[in-house]
Amino acid sequence: MYSGRLFVPLQAEKRKKMKVAVVKYNAGNIYSVIHALQRLGVTPVLTDNPEELQKADKVLFPGQGEASNAMRYLREHNLDKVIRDLKNPILGICIGQQLMCRHSEEGNTDCLGIFDVDVLRFQPQRHEDKVPHMGWNQLRFAQTEELRVKGEKFQLIDSGLFKGFTEGEFVYFVHSFYVPVCADTIATTDYILPFSAALHKDNYYATQFHPEKSGSVGERIIKNFLEL
């Protein structure tokens, strides 16, 4: 009778064979994501080659940087169209999440438009509200939770990215701009106001926080993504 004990090594073996691509573009903090993947037994390729991205089983779109510069690079290398047309799962991280949105206040930048929401700059309400939002903060997510923002209701849906998680896990953030809670929100965090900590639509996943800097919690999130 199968006991489930083979699940972990079988998944690890599957990850070794997986074709994983990391989008190369004008952004920083790429190599910490590559190292996180390597710790999980994955050998990713860092590329701005459209064909390699299209052939990958999973794509990660991480980075820190400025929205207009990043979008300029994506357009010049035809990566904007490639990312919008991907069929396999892709995970945007930090600015990667923001670039998947419709528009960013950072540099008044038109973005990829995958998520139908605009990226806004944090507006401190109190003296103790510091921008950027930097450090550890908690995730809120539940399949039946409803969150009111500006009078609108949104249903938060379990996407599989947080499989096995309980509410209140801490993850690491560094950002001055945020994605408001929207129809594609799957996790929120409170800082100045509730905002989208993670998004999901079809094969597109995104986190505002850095799973690669979030210790064992972040490792589980990356592992869940690879196993989607």
Language model: regions and residue ranges:
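Extreme N-terminal starter segment of soluble prokaryotic enzymes
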Residues: M18-A21
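Short hydrophobic segments within beta-strands
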Residues: V23-Y25
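Short acidic low-complexity segments
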Residues: P44-K55
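Structural motif
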Residues: L60-P62
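Cysteine-nucleophile active-site neighborhood
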Residues: G65-N137
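Amide-donor transfer/coupling interface in amidating biosynthetic enzymes
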Residues: D85, D118-L228
